[in-house]
Curated annotation (Swiss-Prot):
InterPro entries per UniProt: ATNG (IPR047282), FXYD_motif (IPR047297), Ion-transport_regulator_FXYD (IPR000272)
Protein name (database record): Sodium/potassium-transporting ATPase subunit gamma
Gene: Fxyd2
Main location: membrane
Tissue expression from the record: Highest levels expressed in the kidney and spleen. Restricted to the basolateral membrane in renal epithelial cells and varies in its level of expression along the nephron.
Protein's cellular compartments: Membrane
Self-association and partners: Regulatory subunit of the sodium/potassium-transporting ATPase which is composed of a catalytic alpha subunit, an auxiliary non-catalytic beta subunit and an additional regulatory subunit.
CDD domains found in the cross-reference section: FXYD2
The family this protein is said to belong to: Belongs to the FXYD family.
UniProt source species: Rattus norvegicus (Rat)
Length: 66
């Protein structure tokens, strides 16, 4: 407790802070994830738009079913 109050909560010189992040790696990982999510989203949208199968079959609905 005296060590924390002596340096006001900061890390002492010579010791490595366990909460220090490598922001370059985090940034690259986030950009890769965002790019993959974008591509997967486009593939899903385009696969629903350009379906193979020709004409669409519409189901007839009776008034009783409404």
């Amino acid at each position: 407790m005296t060590e924390l109050s002596a340096n006001h909560g900061g890390s002492a010189k010579g010791t490595e802070n366990p909460f220090e992040y490598d922001y370059e790696t985090v940034r690259k990982g986030g950009l890769i994830f965002a790019g993959l999510a974008f591509v997967v989203g486009l593939l899903i949208l385009l696969s629903k738009r350009f379906r193979c199968g020709g004409s669409k079959k519409h189901r007839q609905v009776n008034e009783d079913e409404l």
